[in-house]
Amino acid sequence: MGCLGNSSKTAEDQGVDEKERREANKKIEKQLQKERLAYKATHRLLLLGAGESGKSTIVKQMRILHVNGSNPEEKKQKILDIRKNVKDAIVTIVSAMSTIIPPVPLANPENQFRSDYIKSIAPITDFEYSQEFFDHVKKLWDDEGVKACFERSNEYQLIDCAQYFLERIDSVSLVDYTPTDQDLLRCRVLTSGIFETRFQVDKVNFHMFDVGGQRDERRKWIQCFNDVTAIIYVAACSSYNMVIREDNNTNRLRESLDLFESIWNNRWLRTISIILFLNKQDMLAEKVLAGKSKIEDYFPEYANYTVPEDATPDAGEDPKVTRAKFFIRDLFLRISTATGDGKHYCYPHFTCAVDTENIRRVFNDCRDIIQRMHLKQYELL
């Protein structure tokens, strides 16, 4: 009997346990409330757009501007990716010389063995980037035939950073090469899956989600739609004369327009506004001024397009460039105004994702818009 009496808790002990439970529950509830408030205070931005539009470069800019950029170890890890970009670029160009119509011969026949060497190493995945490789690349890039083939790169699939890194082959080949911020911005690595970047601007928390833009990646987008503050849609304006990698047939800008329309009219996104980044303005200007690929050859309606009276060109901007960029802007705005129901809006901005100052300025301009969307999202406006 004595043993049974000792095993039961006194009323006083039970009271202490109950008090501890209540205090523990209070702490948990307080923490949950804190997390709920932090969640509500966070601006969630979803980056969407077709493949190779510049979404990942925008994320890199946010890291440079708001997360102290990349540390030395991260830069070191990117060296292999950058050298792979060089290899992919030169392999693609020399391989295309014989396949485009009409084909392009080497200007210097003595470079033939170099071209053969580059083609021979194309399938090697764990390639050792020797000085021999860099010497061959440098000589080939100096060949006028290779340059002529590069000028026709809209006829085949070439990464945007090809010229940038081929022109910097001397520094990229150095044993003690350290990538610059601009090198990191230019480096092309295929985005597969969903990547989240967190940063803070003036004590406001932002979560930016970058998802792959290729067709087979888009099924993953739906996972990111929950509680999104705003969509940043990135369109490569310079792609008006290019075709997508997936089928080598569909015009890239048409694909971007179709994708934008499907997002704009998506029933799950009818209340989420879109910030439209009309990207690659630097490359668009180069193409327009070069005059080799005319926009009207791909978009016949351009022939009758007139720049709106309220259009404001950049200082010193060529009128041909102004007309081209506003034409592309209006292609997207035509979609948003045709089916808009007043529940969401489209805010266009001209961007150059590799230009840090441009992205700083544009993102600062967007912050007020994002804040208004956030207040509306939680019915505070």
Curated annotation (Swiss-Prot):
G proteins are composed of 3 units; alpha, beta and gamma. The alpha chain contains the guanine nucleotide binding site. Interacts with GAS2L2. Interacts (GDP-bound form) with RIC8B (via C-terminus); promoting GNAL folding and association with the plasma membrane. The modification Phosphothreonine is found at T178. Residues 275-282 are annotated as: G4 motif. Keywords: Cell membrane, GTP-binding, Hydrolase, Lipoprotein, Magnesium, Membrane, Metal-binding, Nucleotide-binding, Palmitate, Phosphoprotein, Transducer. It is a peripheral membrane protein. The keyword Cytoplasm does not apply. This is Guanine nucleotide-binding protein G(olf) subunit alpha. Residues 10-25 have a biased composition (Basic and acidic residues). GO terms for cellular component: acrosomal vesicle; apical cytoplasm; ciliary necklace; cilium; cytoplasm; heterotrimeric G-protein complex; plasma membrane; sperm midpiece. The keyword GTP-binding applies. Residues 351-356 are annotated as: G5 motif. A lipid is attached at C3 (S-palmitoyl cysteine). It is found in: Cell membrane. It catalyses: GTP + H2O = GDP + phosphate + H(+). InterPro entries: Gprotein_alpha_S, Gprotein_alpha_su, GproteinA_insert, P-loop_NTPase. Mg(2+) binds at S56, T191, D210. Belongs to the G-alpha family. G(s) subfamily. Its EC number is 3.6.5.-. One of its GO terms (molecular function) is GTP binding. Residues 44-57 are annotated as: G1 motif. The gene is Gnal. Guanine nucleotide-binding protein (G protein) involved as transducer in olfactory signal transduction controlled by G protein-coupled receptors (GPCRs). Contains the guanine nucleotide binding site and alternates between an active, GTP-bound state and an inactive, GDP-bound state. Signaling by an activated GPCR promotes GDP release and GTP binding. The alpha subunit has a low GTPase activity that converts bound GTP to GDP, thereby terminating the signal. Both GDP release and GTP hydrolysis are modulated by numerous regulatory proteins. PROSITE patterns: G_ALPHA. It comes from Rattus norvegicus. GTP binds at E52, S53, G54, K55, S56, T57, L185, R186, T191, G213, N279, K280, D282, A353. A lipid is attached at G2 (N-palmitoyl glycine). It comes from the Eukaryota.
